[in-house]
Each structure stands twice: as structure tokens, then as C-alpha cells.
């Protein structure tokens, strides 16, 4: 009896534990997704108390700017009317450092900030030195010539004489460092002296001179603390909610984020939209495929073929015109009226006539397409590669001798890649907190439920087995009683009806 009572207590305890496990598993199945969502919402918003705030304030991911220049092989031939020939030089790689300053939280659920960038040359990652010489179009001379195209002949003659006096030619031979960060040019001083405010710079002229040790404008974005539906969206840039560079309200709108984080809980139907001060416009990327980066699930977003399409191919882009061939965007209105164009490198995804007009271009998606890999649950970029090309439209301008017989062509100057990937301790922490722990909780809830069900079965089985034993004992006892009664009746029959000798013989038998 003691063993039986003890067994009952053990099975009852196991059943109680199983019930607790099962209930806990069910509660976790119901509650864990909601808890994870609340934690994500709490920690991706722009709040000094959130886990991602320091990452947003000073990006821990190493960014690199890789620059490729198109060296002009036949500058004199181009002036005489020949087809341009180019050779790609690079990459010249720079480490890009970013940090936010003047962070001000406003009363309308927004935060304002300036983001500063600085660059350091990385010789070990580069294919060449900043002292390398590159032959490229003289942007100042050719742009000024285009601006004078419809001016009186006397002004053109005066400009030709000024160019000659200052030693200016249609093509120049400068070092990579000068092209990137600026060089002294007497033409700049002359223009600023006689045509003040016509150029956005007063000193040296360089393609990236305005970006080094400077900010990209005052961004005001929504924090998501009070209204999560607008988290990271740009409210204003430099105090305005839309720009005035383009010819339609849609093209002038400042849409999306500042390009660093997006709203969490993305789906394949989501898109990535951001405002780029360098491109002077908002851009939208579209979902392509799922992937994995460092063990972290990602969504890859890429540029649609219509990103730089002209208005005849994609009517919503009509506001960015005047346009030339499809696949390049005229950015002259926000680049001191110089005939500059933005596109994918080597005119990838553009009208084929653009690449065919210049020898040495070989567009292909593997090398020249851009992408962003985003963790869909948090909206945080894991790996990105943004590639863009800057080109100059050049042609002969009658009356300006320096332009000679240059045939109309969109001539590529350079293309660059801004890339960054989460790595090291940052990647490990991100993986543990936002991938591993949710995965452990996900499996734990089902393990608890399964274990609870197994433990609940033990007392049930024990009870069934106990009832079976009682039944068998009762059956065997009842059967034994009937057998004894039959033997006794048979013996009495023999004693009363058979002769005595027979009984003795039967007994002996």
C-alpha cells in the first residue's frame, strides 16, 4: 500500500508540472510575438533610451567610398570630332566617417540633426595613389561654353580670349587628389570676381570638395515615439518640406527617410524610399529577393529600371526633364547649371546608344547595379552598395575655340560606390539580441508545450493501468471461485452415485 500511495503522489506531481509547462507554452505562443514586436518598436525609435540610438547617432559600420575615374585616351581626337575613348582607373578607396551633431528633439515628435562626413584615403585597399594623373573634361570650361551658346558672338570671343589667357583647355590633366578635393583655378577667381554668386564655391574646385568635413544639410525626421507610423520619415530638409529644383510637385517632394533606417516589419510588398541631397531628389528602391547576411535574414532592395528613365519611358519622371536619352538624369538645376547627368555606372540600365557612343564602357548588372540588404524585422541595413555615375554633356559651341569640333556626347567623368556592411562585435550583438534570442523563445514555447503534454499523459496512463490491474484481479478471482465450486460438485456426485471401489479407484487416479 505504501508503494502504491507513493507512485500516485509522483504521477500526480508529474501531471501538475506537465500542466504548468503546457499552460506556459500556450501563453508563450500567444504572447511572445507581441512581446517581440513591442521590444522592436521600443528599440528602433529615435530615443536616447532605445538600444539603437547610439548606432543611429554615430554609425558603427565602416563605410567606404570607392571612386573610379574615366581617363580620356584621345583628348585631342575628341576636339577634332573623334569618338571618345576612355579607360577606367581605380578604385581609389576612402574610409568614410559619419557622425551626427546638433541633435535637437522637437515638440512635434521630430528630431533635427546635422550629419558630418569626412574621408581618409586607404592606400592598401586602392588600386593607385592620389598622386595618379587623370585626363578628364574641364568641367568649368565646357560648362561655361554651354551656358554661352546662345549669347552674342562678341561675348563668346571675349570668353575664348579669357580661356586662352588663363591657359584653359577643353581637357585637363589633374591628380586624383586634385579632382576629388579641389584645385586652385584662376578661372574660378575670375568668375567670382565679375559674376558673384554664380558659383556655389569660392575657393578650390573639386568633385567631392563640398562633401569632406561638411554636413549634408539639416534633416528633421520623425522619431516614432508618439506616432510610430511615421518613424524615420523626413519631415523637412533645410527647413523645407519640398525642394524647387524640378518641374512638378511630385518630383520636388521630399519622401521617405534620410537613408539610414526604415520602418520595421517589412514585407516583400514594402519599398525603400529616401531623400538624397547629393542627387537633389527622393529615390525609391524595390524588393528583389530574400537572403541571409551573417546569419541574419535580409530583404534585398534594388533600383527599378525606371529610376533614371526619361519622361517618355516613365511619365512620372517628366518633372525631372529636360531629358536626353532614357537612363540618365539631368541634375544641372541643382549643380550650378552645369550640364551634369546622374546614372548607373557605365550607363547600365540606360539607352544602349549612350554606352555605344563612348569606347571603353561595359555595363553589366553584377558590377554596376546597386542594392541594400535590410533586416526586415527592424528596418536596419545590414549590407549596402550604392553605385552612381556622374557624366558631362559636351559638344562644340560655335564661337568658342576651345570646344573645337567636339561631337555631342554624354561623357562619363567618374563613378563611385558607397558601401558598408555590419561586422565584428556589432554584428554579433545584433545577431544575439534580434535573431538568436527570438529564435530560442520561438522553439522554447513549443518544447514546453510538447513536454507538458507528455508529462500530462503519465498520470493518465498510470490511472488506466491501475484500473486494468483491478479488473484482471477481479476476473481471475471470480474464475477461481467457479472452478472450486465445479470440483466440489463433481466430487459429491462421485461419492453418491458410484460404487465404493470405483470411488477408490477414481481417487487413486
UniProtKB/Swiss-Prot annotation:
The chain crosses the membrane at residues 12-32, 441-461. Keywords: Cell membrane, Disulfide bond, Glycoprotein, Membrane, Receptor, Transmembrane, Transmembrane helix. Glycans are attached at residues 102, 108, 173, 212, 227, 255, 310, 330, 383. Residues 33-440 are extracellular. It is found in: Cell membrane; Membrane, Caveola. Pfam families: CD36. GO terms for molecular function: amyloid-beta binding; apolipoprotein A-I binding; high-density lipoprotein particle binding; high-density lipoprotein particle receptor activity; lipid binding; lipopolysaccharide binding; lipopolysaccharide immune receptor activity; low-density lipoprotein particle binding. N-glycosylated. GO terms for biological process: adhesion of symbiont to host; blood vessel endothelial cell migration; cholesterol catabolic process; cholesterol efflux; cholesterol homeostasis; cholesterol import; detection of lipopolysaccharide; endothelial cell proliferation. Residues 1-11, 462-509 are cytoplasmic. One of its GO terms (cellular component) is cell surface. Its main location: membrane. It is a multi-pass membrane protein. The keyword Transmembrane applies. Disulfide bonds join 251-384. Receptor for different ligands such as phospholipids, cholesterol ester, lipoproteins, phosphatidylserine and apoptotic cells. Receptor for HDL, mediating selective uptake of cholesteryl ether and HDL-dependent cholesterol efflux. Also facilitates the flux of free and esterified cholesterol between the cell surface and apoB-containing lipoproteins and modified lipoproteins, although less efficiently than HDL. May be involved in the phagocytosis of apoptotic cells, via its phosphatidylserine binding activity. Belongs to the CD36 family. This is Scavenger receptor class B member 1. The lineage of its organism: Eukaryota, Metazoa, Chordata, Craniata, Vertebrata. The gene is SCARB1.
